[in-house]
Amino acid sequence: IFTTMPEETGIDIDLGIGAAPEGVLAAGALRCIGGQMQGRLILDTEEKRSRAAGMGVKAPNKTYDRTEMARGDVIVAATGVTDGALLKGVRFTKDVIETETVVYRSATGTVRRIQAEHREFAKFHLD
């Protein structure tokens, strides 16, 4: 996702592999902030080909762009679990659990950053 902000990162392009759900999430976030992405399915086993056919995939070798992978008004929210380039991980202090979240919306191009302090620990089931 950061590759769409080369002024901040110095990164112009990113290559990677992952499963389809991760690709859809990345495509959705990139749609929201003006980035580009292409992806294709790797159907290298009969099980994967059958599953794709059952899900309605008609062109198994097609290269999809970000608008084909994430259609409509897309909203993507991500909260850091461990520290990364985009988000800080969860922080535990004596009285507070701190989280950092980013929320993207394609219809408006809005990016919201939320830094939250959670004081009700019971909801996290940390026992």
Report residues per predicted region.
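An extended, acidic
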Residues: 1-105, 121
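Non-transmembrane, aqueous-exposed alpha-helical and coiled segments at domain scale
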Residues: 106-108, 116-118
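Extracellular glycan-interaction surfaces
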Residues: 113
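Short, surface-exposed linear segments at secondary-structure transitions and domain or protein termini
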Residues: 121-127
